[in-house]
Amino acid sequence: MSGLTFRPTKGRWITHLSRPRSCGPSGLFVPPSPPLDPEKIKELQRFISLSKKLLVMTGAGISTESGIPDYRSEKVGLYARTDRRPIQHIDFVRSAPVRQRYWARNFVGWPQFSSHQPNPAHWALSNWERLGKLHWLVTQNVDALHSKAGSQRLTELHGCMHRVLCLNCGEQTARRVLQERFQALNPSWSAEAQGVAPDGDVFLTEEQVRSFQVPCCDRCGGPLKPDVVFFGDTVNPDKVDFVHRRVKEADSLLVVGSSLQVYSGYRFILTAREQKLPIAILNIGPTRSDDLACLKLDSRCGELLPLIDPRRQHSDVQRLEMNFPLSSAAQDP
């Protein structure tokens, strides 16, 4: 369990994270995986080479190598390490004490969460876009790591923690600006947390939370919320329609680092199936759509994706000669 301390000192705010020295941030939250299989690498290379309009959908598993935990990974995910569960949308909207607790914890966790950097998997996908291989990238993550890596053909399905909005008037604010307002309102407040959650949340006691002051919207005085989809909320229908159109334009779909347990992402796999698109999945552990995939790889995203050359062509290989034909489930009408 890692410990995180946030306290004011000599006019500055200090954040300190302690973790076991034997575990670097890139491996702390990554579940065990088998060694890379050269044959699987070749199969993924062929899949990518034959793709002309590739759509990629990423989940929390792509960011664990950047030091951000996921929810469901065996032994290392939030659900495996603790009985804590993410905040529910209805609780946040209805309860001022719930918002106070959320923002106090988020305030402590923000310096660490916002400092995370893209790993080789994020950079690889950004490079695929630059070289014209990637038609569109859809991420279920809220960490902004794809944007930091330079991806532009990007939809952040569940929003982004780096933005804050007012629940009354919809005014948007940069999260870093809100951090300064938190500091101004809580000049002598300090806290020590145990454990970090996938969305930058940390774990504080009720006593620590009680004295924390939360700012309101500068424009209308309304309550503030991170611009993300909390559990129990729904994705904006216009955004869903937009992604459905991108899937229908694509000729193949690659899932990276997602178990697809959440319907907001899984629905696009169903659309791809309806379109009879070949589907490949790169994820450590089983997913909800393994039976729909023509290729499944249990490897670290940051180890495998950089090995794929998006410029390589297989003009001598016909789609019907692929070693991993579409599964019968994917061919069903």
Swiss-Prot record:
GO cellular component terms listed in the entry, alphabetical order: mitochondrial inner membrane; mitochondrial matrix; mitochondrion
Transit peptide per record: 1-25
Entry binding sites for Zn(2+): 166, 169, 217, 220
Active site feature: 158
Tissue: Detected in kidney, heart, brain, liver and pancreatic islets (at protein level).
EC number assigned by the record: 2.3.1.-, 2.4.2.-, 2.3.1.286
Main localization, broad class: mitochondrion
Subcellular location: Mitochondrion matrix
Domain Deacetylase sirtuin-type intervals: 34-323
Binding locations of NAD(+): 59-79, 140-143, 257-259, 283-285, 301
Induction or repression: Expression is directly activated by ATF4/CREB2. In response to mTORC1 signal, expression is down-regulated due to degradation of ATF4/CREB2. Induced following DNA damage. The expression is strongly inhibited by fasting.
Family membership: Belongs to the sirtuin family. Class II subfamily.
Oligomer and partners: Interacts with IDE and SLC25A5. Interacts with GLUD1. Interacts with DLAT and PDHX. Interacts with MCCC1 (via the biotin carboxylation domain). Interacts with PCCA and PC.
Record's protein name: NAD-dependent protein lipoamidase sirtuin-4, mitochondrial
Organism: Mus musculus
Lineage: Eukaryota, Metazoa, Chordata, Craniata, Vertebrata
